[in-house]
């Protein structure tokens, strides 16, 4: 903890002396004017509030570089961290380099940058003739509205800041981009010196803290690290400089500081990389990790804590958040941590009723309304819930950082980025304030964006946790390189394998499509679809050869038998096996008018009667079916036969049988045509099912064996039934 009296006294001799004229900015006459002030007056200005002149300031605005009294600080806090980053001089936890920077900037005239037009008397230069002249308030003036209006004009609207003019551009083309580039080049040169006021003026006017100088091949942060300017580094970090930026030699500012033996600056840059997690760990009651020894994270240990199902779901959702959204969440949590710390100090240090508290984060006009709502809802978490959320974020940040270390070729993930630049990322460019004129009129701090949330139970209270230090040891470069090469090689192999499999799938798909089209065309253009008329007789003197019941329009003698036929068809029962007799009433025995005429198409091609040839080929199919059934019977392992060849033999025999009907005349009967269609379809299916059964037997898949066996039996039954129908036409 640091105390204002000892702080100011310790730095008085260092920062009160008149600045060196060689480092003064010729464009800012206030510097030379202040350097000629008596020592007593200069000392007096450094010990007073920068906004109202009150003595014994107890707060400081880090990014403004001024000290503040409690009255003015209350207004600064209500503006938000995107305007002013305030911290208590007496009770705040300060980094020595940051405290040194604030006192140095305050002592060397930071207020002359924010009150430029107020000091030179041109307070009406930014408005019309009806704009009233501004007067700097005194300590005795009322906080509202005198002090608050002045502070908002000074720090929000930047009314008194010397704004850059496009006519001042050297190339005379009036380009805003060229003006910003010129300001950035001057900032790049200024950070090599100790003149903080000049650098602050360039930043306020719109210079880019991450500007990459094409000739010097470096950024301003590289230059400040190279020349050992610790205060300049703090200013650049506060205004958003990237601590991981690379120069033309591929070096970061940290590596450049070490190369120039600026070890203290190197340690500070290393701490800045982990400022977010350090701040959260400290807020949780932990000790700041020793980054120099490789310890970057201290996460509370939740051993023995009851984890609810809701908390598990919330943690799972947190891990699915994209890196960019995770960065924004960490930024908002960082701001909320700062608000709660300041609020705790504020509640114990002020007794004035006019000093309003800040119950939630003020609205930031540079953020969306949805995000502002989410930021303000963070204040609804109680201490236990907020602690649980911070702990989960720390764990997930470490997980994302480890993933980034395992995949260095990828872009930096949220954990990597948030540990480096998030504490300063929400300091918007002040040049945007010149163009927009301050806050969005639709957003007001008097009417905060605050609505009910869906649920407050995502993070249930977490019991007290012990602390466990996690040490990260940097991996060896050689091993990491070898591992990365191995992973790249494996990745390429997997990609080639996937491409090969895709080609195989595409080839099989095309072949399948071709086969389907061929089968469809063969079925549609088959000679069996031609109309033919076959005189069928359903009578059989032999009960062993009972015919199948086929639909017919009437009997041969012209008697109507539709009612009997329909009743007989409804009582047909499917046999349990292909050899079991059908239980069909013998309805055809009463028919005595049997046609015995043999037509010309009933002669086979070799001169044999057609019916005799059909019977011969049908017997062959029957033998093949019996062989298949025997092969499917359970036998010892050494006597098992392959099922697939039997399917091929059956297909060949059935094909020969169907070939006899190739020359049928177009007057064949419908039952014959349907029977041949059924026989053709089942002939194709039985070979396929036999192959599937063989594969199931080889894989010893009992469920598949049972299923495929039923399919094979079903196909064999239909083939036998169709053959029986064809044979009975001739008996």
UniProtKB/Swiss-Prot annotation:
GO biological process: brain development; mushroom body development; negative regulation of organ growth; positive regulation of hippo signaling; protein localization to presynapse; regulation of ARF protein signal transduction; regulation of G protein-coupled receptor signaling pathway; somatic muscle development
Protein name: ARF GTPase-activating protein Git
Region described as Disordered: 124-145, 435-461, 537-582
Source species of the chain: Drosophila melanogaster
Major subcellular site: cytoplasm
Annotated keywords: ANK repeat, Cell junction, Cell projection, Coiled coil, Cytoplasm, Cytoskeleton, GTPase activation, Metal-binding, Repeat, Synapse, Zinc, Zinc-finger
Record field: compositional bias (Acidic residues): 443-459
Effect of loss of the gene: Homozygous knockout flies show a semi-lethal phenotype and exhibit defective wing morphology at 100% penetrance. Mutant embryos show striking guidance phenotypes in ventral oblique muscle 5 (VO5) and ventral oblique muscle 6 (VO6), characterized by bypass and mistargeting of the mutant muscles toward the ventral midline. Defects in targeting of the growing ventral tips of mutant muscles toward the ventral midline are already detectable at late stage 14/early stage 15 embryos.
Quaternary context: May form homodimers (via coiled coil). Forms a complex with pix and Pak; the interaction with Pak may be indirect and mediated by pix/dPIX.
Gene Ontology CC: one annotated term: lamellipodium
ZnF C4-type: positions: 49-72
Superkingdom of this protein's organism: Eukaryota
Ranges of compositional bias, category Low complexity: 557-570
UniProt domain Arf-GAP: residue ranges: 32-168
Alphabetical list of InterPro entries matching this protein: Ankyrin_rpt, Ankyrin_rpt-contain_sf, ARFGAP/RecO, ArfGAP_dom, ArfGAP_dom_sf, GIT-like, GIT1_C, GIT_SHD
């Amino acid at each position: 903890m640091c105390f204002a009296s000892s702080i100011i006294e310790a730095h008085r001799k260092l920062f009160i002396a008149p600045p060196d004229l060689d480092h003064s900015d010729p464009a800012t006459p206030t510097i030379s004017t202040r350097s000629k002030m008596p020592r007593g007056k200069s000392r007096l200005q450094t010990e007073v509030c920068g906004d109202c002149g009150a003595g014994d300031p107890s707060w400081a605005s880090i990014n403004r570089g001024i000290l503040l009294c409690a009255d003015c600080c209350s207004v600064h806090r209500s503006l938000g961290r995107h305007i002013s980053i305030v911290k208590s001089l007496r009770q705040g936890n300060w980094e020595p380099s940051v405290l040194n920077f604030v006192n140095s900037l305050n002592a060397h005239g930071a207020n002359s940058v924010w009150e430029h037009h107020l000091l030179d008397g041109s307070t009406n230069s930014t408005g019309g003739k009806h704009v009233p002249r501004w007067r700097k308030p005194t300590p005795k003036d009322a906080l509202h509205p005198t002090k608050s209006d002045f502070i908002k004009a000074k720090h929000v609207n930047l009314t008194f800041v010397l704004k850059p003019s496009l006519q001042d551009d050297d190339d005379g083309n009036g380009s805003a981009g060229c003006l910003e580039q010129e300001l950035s080049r001057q900032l790049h040169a200024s950070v090599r010196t100790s003149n903080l006021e000049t650098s602050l003026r360039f930043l306020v006017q719109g210079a880019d803290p991450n500007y990459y100088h094409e000739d010097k091949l470096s950024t301003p942060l590289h230059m400040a690290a190279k020349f050992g300017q610790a205060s300049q580094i703090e200013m650049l970090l506060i205004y958003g400089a990237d601590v991981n930026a690379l120069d033309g030699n591929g070096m970061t500012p940290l590596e450049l500081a070490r190369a120039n033996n600026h070890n203290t600056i190197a340690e500070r840059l290393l701490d800045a990389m982990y400022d977010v997690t350090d701040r959260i760990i400290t807020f949780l009651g932990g000790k700041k990790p020793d980054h120099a020894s490789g310890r970057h994270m201290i996460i509370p240990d939740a051993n023995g804590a009851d984890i609810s199902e809701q908390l598990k779901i919330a943690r799972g959702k947190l891990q699915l958040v994209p890196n960019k959204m995770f960065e924004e969440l960490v930024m908002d949590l960082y701001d909320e941590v700062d608000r709660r710390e300041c609020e705790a100090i504020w509640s114990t240090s002020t007794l004035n009723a006019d000093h309003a508290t800040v119950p939630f984060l003020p609205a930031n006009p540079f953020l969306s309304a949805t995000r502002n709502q989410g930021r303000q809802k963070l204040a609804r978490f109680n201490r236990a819930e907020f602690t649980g959320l911070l702990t989960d974020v720390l764990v997930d940040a470490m997980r994302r950082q480890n993933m980034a270390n395992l995949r260095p070729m990828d872009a930096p993930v949220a954990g990597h980025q948030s540990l480096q630049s998030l504490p300063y990322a929400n300091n918007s460019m002040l040049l945007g304030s010149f163009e927009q004129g301050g806050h969005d009129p639709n957003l007001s701090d008097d009417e905060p964006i605050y609505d009910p949330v869906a649920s407050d139970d995502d993070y249930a209270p977490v019991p007290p946790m012990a602390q466990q230090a996690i040490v990260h040891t940097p991996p060896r470069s050689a091993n990491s390189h070898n591992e990365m090469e191995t992973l790249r090689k494996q990745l390429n192999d997997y990609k080639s394998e996937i491409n090969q499999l895709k080609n195989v799938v595409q080839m099989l798909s095309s072949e399948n499509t071709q086969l389907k089209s061929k089968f469809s065309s063969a079925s549609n253009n088959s000679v069996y679809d031609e109309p033919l008329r076959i005189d069928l007789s359903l009578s059989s003197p032999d009960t062993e050869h009972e015919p199948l019941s086929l639909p017919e329009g009437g009997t041969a003698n012209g008697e109507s038998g539709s009612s009997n036929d329909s009743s007989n068809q409804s009582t047909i029962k499917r046999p349990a096996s292909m050899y079991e007799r059908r239980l069909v009433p013998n309805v055809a025995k009463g028919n005595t008018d049997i046609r015995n005429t043999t037509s010309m198409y009933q002669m086979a091609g070799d001169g044999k009667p057609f019916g005799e040839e059909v019977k011969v080929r049908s017997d062959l199919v029957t033998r093949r079916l019996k062989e298949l059934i025997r092969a499917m019977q359970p036998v010892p392992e050494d006597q098992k036969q392959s099922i697939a060849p039997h399917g091929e033999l059956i297909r060949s025999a059935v094909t020969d049988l169907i070939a006899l009907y190739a020359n049928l005349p177009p007057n064949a009967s419908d039952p014959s045509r349907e029977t041949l269609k059924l026989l053709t379809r089942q002939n194709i299916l039985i070979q396929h099912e036999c192959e599937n059964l063989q594969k199931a037997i080889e894989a010893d898949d009992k469920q598949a064996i049972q299923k495929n066996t039923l399919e094979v039996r079903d196909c064999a039954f239909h083939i036998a039934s169709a053959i029986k129908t064809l044979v009975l036409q001739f008996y």
